[in-house]
Amino acid sequence: MLTSVRSLMAATLLVGSAFVATPVLAQDDEEVTEAEVEADSAFSISGNVALVSDYRFRGVSLSAGDPALQGGIDVSHESGFYIGTWASSIQGGTPYGELELDVYGGWTGEVASGVTVDVGLLYYVYPTTDDPLNLDPDTDYFEPYASISTTVGPVGATAGVAYAWEQDSLGGNDNLYLYTDFSLAIPGTPVTATAHAGYTDGVLAPPFLAGTGDDTGLDWSLGLTAAVYGGLSVGVSYVGVEGPSIDGFTDDAIVATLSFAA
């Protein structure tokens, strides 16, 4: 019911970001062939780290309204295939614990002029499961995803879907998530405005998590992000969900973000 891990150390992320692949340099007395250079540059490694005032996953707080540390590392091939991992600190209590770790892989590429698709499989893992009664709860689950995006001038748009089939960790139920994202780069400034809307049909719907029994619900957000220097950026967003407002869980919130990516 979550999406990332925040306990991944900032140092780990910064080291990961420093691993960005570059062409092979001279190796003492060994001659580097053109083929070796091409093979090396076919892969790239990127990293990111962020501090957020509240970890909101599809509008629902997974950090009880408190700050969270997040980060991830991706390895990509020029063919479009990639693998990666992302982590976040959480306050999941019983049985989710204090850490979410996401492992994923997929393919992304341009399928038409200005149109990009992204398809893959995401695995949500909770390695610090809180199990005081030794019930050995099943918390981890898989979720395939797909999205299509395009950019026209300063405007970007994405539509996506994620579907978790029936799994024990979801109580034997499934979950469908549909969403759309928009971005607008404000000309002459380092600021980008963003908007998001999502719809959940399943056990992860905000109203269902809030205890209403309604397994459908909406989430939304509006935000601004500003590039500060290099890969450093700051952002703020207003996040809301459909259903009862539970403080530190399903209430509307203003979320601040400080992030670095390389």
What are these regions (language model features)?
Residues 1-44:
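Cleavable N-terminal export/targeting peptides
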Residues 39-53, 81:
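Transmembrane beta-strand segments of Gram-negative outer membrane beta-barrel proteins
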Residues 41-43, 65-69, 97-101, 138-142, ...:
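Residues that define the transmembrane beta-barrel architecture of outer-membrane proteins
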Residues 51-57, 87-91, 109, 123-127, ...:
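Transmembrane beta-strands of outer-membrane beta-barrel pores
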Residues 74-80, 106-110, 149-153, 183-187, ...:
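Structural signature of outer-membrane beta-barrel channels/translocons
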Residues 79-85, 113-119, 153-159, 188-195, ...:
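Repeated loop/turn-to-beta-strand initiation elements of outer-membrane beta-barrel proteins
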Residues 139-212:
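Detector for outer-membrane/organellar transmembrane beta-barrel domains
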